[in-house]
Amino acid sequence: RDIDVSGFDTSNVTNMGYMFCNSGFHKSEDLRNFDTSKVTNMADMFAWCVCLESLDLSGFDTSNVVNMTEMFDSCYNMTSLNISGFDTSKVTSMRYMFRDCNVLRKINMKGFNTSNVTDMSGMFQNCDAMTSLNVTGIDTSHVTDMAHMFFGCRSLKKLVLTGFDTSGVTDMSGMFSGCTGVTSVDVSSFDTSKVTGMSGMFRGCLSLTSLDVSGFDTSEVTDMNSMFYGCTKLTSVNVSGFDTSKVTDLG
């Protein structure tokens, strides 16, 4: 069923959370004149819009948005997404932002200001069609949660994490779990001094042939369950320097 919002006056709207969630909305051209200048909440705005194939939000004013949690979650059929004009300088949560965007091949985050983001858990989870992702330049200095961030990105061959600041991160559980196509991932510069959760961090990385975790500070880690489970092509991994004094689960 068509949802025509082309005539809406949204100049005073502050909350657009769940606005089109689980609806038949599919015409992004209706949003060309949307005034989003006062909006602070866009959580789940387009979540479960399974009829949506293309979405152009380049004209959205997101300068006051704080919450983008699950904004595009489970847009199963969306092949094109334009968020090139997004101002994310006030955003604190991008949790599950693109989760289950199964056929989306590219996400352009160039210009994203993520300096205030604290939660990136599950951000790209199950983006099955994405073959490469460059998050170089993304400011992660305030992020505390990266659990399942790249979980299930099965087609991902190349993942560039240059400059990733993980100094404040406490949870990396399942961060790369299920990235079955990745042959190598450079985490040698990761600061893991505050991390408590590493369970399933590399679980199911079937193609992973090299991994340098020799510099990991694991002094605060309590859970390493299945950390390298299913890494069948990984012939060696140096964990000789791991401090497991606080670990309660090594299953």
Task: Walk through the language-model features, giving the residues of each.
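Short beta-strand elements of solenoid repeat domains
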Residues: Y18-N22, D44-W48, T69-S74, Y96-D100, ...
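Structural signature of tandem-repeat unit edges
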Residues: R1-T14, G24-T40, C51-V66, Y76-T92, ...
